Structure formats: structure tokens, C-alpha cells
Amino acid sequence: MPASHPHQHLVNHPPIMINLTENSEHPEYNTTQVDYLRSDKPFVVIHFIQECGRKLEADSLTICTAASLFHKFSASASLSHYCPYLMSATCLYLAGKVEDNHLKLRDVINVVHSVLHRSLEPLPLGDQYWNTRDAIVQAELFLLRVCQFSVRFSHPHKYLLHYLKSLKDWMAAEVWTKYPIARTSWAMLHDLYHDPLVVTADPSTVALACTQLALETFGIQVPFVASDTWWQVMDEKVSKDKMWEIMTRIMEVYSKESEMIDSLAIK
């Protein structure tokens, strides 16, 4: 890899927010307990959505749709006027409907309460529970209006799955076996949902950027083609500049993780 490459410093630097497992589409995330109530920054709220989604055993697309809904809401409404954690619970509940992965509202309320208030007992069926339930139902209608009832997203997942299968056939079997290219690509995609760019970026380009950055992480070059053009075989319309932009944003996510999340860790 040329010394002037903009992402050379990432070689041999694995993702820091996740522990990669055999299930590539569902990486095992950092289990550090976070005191979310100390921050209302969107990055932290997305981290909260992802933790709650995993505890609800929601599927990958549901969690990513919930994150996308929050980004879309944040782009149109002032977060200072709304409780971000009420809206994140609402995003999860609505995302379950959008992706046909229905989440019981009672489960959403209980999980959100337990993650926000880790030292408290589960929320009893009293006034606080029913008030929270009513608030989420009303917030769901508000969220739909803010999003102009456009709540479906073209996620990069199907593109990434296709590109990884193609790349596996392209590369030497021993390289694919030795390095967790697929798992790292999936992890980077999931982590990119901390950034609102994922809502507006071309999903094919996002998928290719995650794959390219995973290759660079392990210092791997695709054979029989220039290392910086292999993705054009997959999608000829992809812009190199856009690829670099997305790869840079992925790395910024990992920088923000230590800045915003680690500082909120419960000791």
C-alpha cells in the first residue's frame, strides 16, 4: 500500500466498538454499561438505540431503520425541544412495524427504562408506565408527520451481502479464511449508523466503502486489479471521492466512540 494512502494508518487497527463473532450480520457489541442520561448528543442516542435494539432481540434492519428514523427526525426538528430518549424509543417501536419485526410496546418501555435506569427495579404497571405508553403512542404520530410518512430506507445491507459473496469468490480461499473481512465489513456498516450520512449516502457506495476499509484494515489487496479500482467492477458509477468520504466518516465514528461513549461508562 502506498505510503501516501489516506487510510494507511488504519492497517492492523480493528474496529474498537465491537467484538467480531461468527455471525457476520449481528456483531457482538461492546458491553460497557453507559450512563446515557448524562448526554443528549445524537451520537450517544444512536448508541442507546442500538443497545436497546439488541436487548429487544430486534433484527439488524430494524435497529438500522430505528437509527435512520432518529437521524431523519433530528434533521427536521430541534432536539432541544424533545426528549431524545422518548423519541428513540418511538423510533424503535415504529421501526419494528416498518420492517415487519413487531416489537411489543410494553417490551420497548421496559427495556428503555432498564437501560436508562440500570439501578432501578423494572417499571411497574402504574401511572408512570401508562404515561410513558401514551407518550410513545403520541410521539409515533408526531414522528410520522415530521418524516412526512416516508419511513422506509434503502439500506446498504443487501449490497454488502452481494459484494462480499462476489469478493469471496474473487479472492484466494486462504486469505478469506485467515482474515475476518466479511465480519469487519458488517461491523463497520453497523457502526456507520451513528453518522447521519448513512441516511443520504448511496447504499451501494456505503457497502463498497465498508468493504474497502475492511480490506485496508488487514492490508489486503484484491488480486488481478488495481487496489483502488476493484469496486468499479462491482458498481461502475461509484465515485472514488465519495468512497474516501464514507471511509473517513467510519473512522471518525471510532474516534467519537472513545470521546463520547467511554466517558459515560459506569465504573
Give names to the regions the model predicted.
Residues 1-20, 200, 205-267:
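C-terminal functional regions that serve as terminal interaction/effector modules
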Residues 1-61:
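A eukaryotic "domain-start" boundary segment
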Residues 39-208, 212-241:
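Structured all-alpha helical bundle cores of eukaryotic regulatory proteins
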